[in-house]
Amino acid sequence: MPFLELDTNLPANRVPAGLEKRLCAAAASILGKPADRVNVTVRPGLAMALSGSTEPCAQLSISSIGVVGTAEDNRSHSAHFFEFLTKELALGQDRFPTVLSTSPAAHGGPRCPGEIIEGKKSCLNEEALFIYFI
């Protein structure tokens, strides 16, 4: 279940209407997950500085169990999100980092009481954080 958080210093009136739905669909396609399992939050109008500058920028944080993988996969995911969001938000190429982090299965709660989370070896203590500038 991927969680995407898009933070931007763009005012709300510069964020295209329906972006959260389009980002959800794009994330499902890029990450290979069903859209009904993707969660998106868009936060416009934030006080942000990127590389010391307050020029328009955005940051996408993606966390998921089993989606964030190899460096090659993460570069590919980042490139696809970069392409999608720079067009949607009309941002410069140097104004949009993507942060990918794996969420250990132990960090996710069961969907209903008593449910056991299936899967192979738990990735406890194997959390990874990747930041890419494409």
From Swiss-Prot:
Principal location: cytoplasm
UniProt-listed Enzyme Commission number(s): 4.1.1.-
Cellular-component GO terms for this entry: cytoplasm; extracellular exosome; extracellular space
InterPro entries registered for this protein in UniProt: Macrophage_inhib_fac, Macrophage_inhib_fac_CS, Tautomerase/MIF_sf
Keyword Lyase among UniProt keywords: yes
SUPFAM superfamilies in alphabetical order: Tautomerase/MIF
Keyword annotations from UniProtKB, A to Z: Cytoplasm, Lyase
Function comment: May have lyase activity.
Family of the protein in this entry: Belongs to the MIF family.
PANTHER family, per database record: D-DOPACHROME DECARBOXYLASE (PTHR11954), D-DOPACHROME DECARBOXYLASE-LIKE PROTEIN (PTHR11954:SF39)
Protein name as catalogued: D-dopachrome decarboxylase-like protein
Protein's organism: Homo sapiens (Human)
Gene: DDTL
